[in-house]
């Protein structure tokens, strides 16, 4: 039973990463505009944006262009990118980076004040704007948070977790039921923007905050929203394998600087898997590491020659993580493992963040604009959050309809921690880098058992969506690898999913 009700004039934004806060800033541009941000954790903690190391990819040099950036994005996306969305991202990307710099994001600069740009895997040009080598996410978020706190129209509620999307009798989203400081609160609004991040916390090994576990995806699906491409989960190939949860990340930029992947025998093995070697797309590199580890040869990142003595100031986050485990990356190889890093799927939206339900928007990793395809290009995630977060904020702020009273005020079922930890292990085992029908079928049965015991809540629904779509896609493409269906179909076809009762109903549409 709700303890009190709030009626809010502007959009309510669930999540406080780069997409959510950019949406809030965009929604409050202009007189008398307001936005309410709900964050389950204090700002600057608990969101993947603040953990991002590589930077933001954009055509910021005279040797580059949005068209080249778009071509690289589409190539990495393995046939499933929406060209219109990619074109928009790459055209608006340079200004998005400049806007963040204007807010105070301290991007690395050259003597002429131009951006220092790095090369990363599957990019045809150096186009990644960085901060302090590997500190882009934290520095960008600090600047954005300062701007949010300085904007009178933005209200932030920390320790606030969404428990249900509120809908009227016509299905319109009219607000959110949230646990705010232990009280169940009915928040009515003209629009809700989901900016809840990805699904890393559904897996045992992830580079994202463990509390980012697909709840926004599940909330939207349980409300009846269309979900796109949930089977496509990106595994970053070089999480630092030191037994920490979440696993620290060894940024892609290290390989861009010339770091080499070796096995325990010291052999540089990437030439056996792809002509681009260490700079192959992430899905290729992740599968190569998985194969080396499965064969008992181990996998290590050797940056002793490429970075060496420069580690402490060029890649301080990686250096600190390694040293905390007794590994000196200036002289020793770094043990690495694939880890869940990003979800290409999400709530299906148009180019302004509109979901299939009136009143509902989504931006950032929890959305699927069609930009990322079956495999995200390195350093496109912060860019997508900034570009599409701003667009969603503007569109949601323009919503005029309020809808009727909500038909249900009951919180959706939660999942106890012990059950969640078991789910994480099962997801890594059967819906990980390598998948097959036997494992996915077994995993789906385990999810059904958990649903029978704990109810069909957002976390389990998010897991079910991933597994059901992975079982249905009988091919290998991008981040989805089926060892029982290793070939890639000639025509790329996206997945669209809606929940119909307990079972996801899948349909496909060629892009």
From Swiss-Prot:
Entry's Gene Ontology BP terms: 'de novo' NAD biosynthetic process from L-aspartate
Pathway the protein takes part in: Cofactor biosynthesis; NAD(+) biosynthesis; iminoaspartate from L-aspartate (oxidase route): step 1/1
Cofactor(s) the record lists: FAD
Source taxon at top rank: Bacteria
Keyword annotations from UniProtKB, A to Z: Cytoplasm, FAD, Flavoprotein, Nucleotide-binding, Oxidoreductase, Pyridine nucleotide biosynthesis
EC number(s) on file: 1.4.3.16
Residues where FAD binds: 16-19, 48-55, 365, 381-382
Marked site positions, Important in orienting the L-aspartate substrate: 120
Active site: 282 (proton donor/acceptor)
Record keyword Oxidoreductase present: yes
Alphabetical list of Pfam families matching this protein: FAD_binding_2 (PF00890), Succ_DH_flav_C (PF02910)
Cofactor binding note of this UniProt entry: Binds 1 FAD per subunit.
InterPro entries found in the cross-reference section: FAD-dep_OxRdtase_2_FAD-bd, FAD/NAD-bd_sf, Fum_R/Succ_DH_flav-like_C_sf, Fum_Rdtase/Succ_DH_flav-like_C, NadB, Succ_DH/fumarate_Rdtase_cat_sf
Cellular compartments per GO CC: cytoplasm
GO molecular function, a single term: L-aspartate oxidase activity
SUPFAM superfamilies: FAD/NAD(P)-binding domain, Succinate dehydrogenase/fumarate reductase flavoprotein C-terminal domain, Succinate dehydrogenase/fumarate reductase flavoprotein, catalytic domain
Reactions that this protein is recorded to catalyse: L-aspartate + O2 = iminosuccinate + H2O2
UniProt subcellular location: Cytoplasm
Entry similarity comment: Belongs to the FAD-dependent oxidoreductase 2 family. NadB subfamily.
UniProt function note: Catalyzes the oxidation of L-aspartate to iminoaspartate, the first step in the de novo biosynthesis of NAD(+).
Name of this chain's protein: L-aspartate oxidase
Annotated gene: nadB
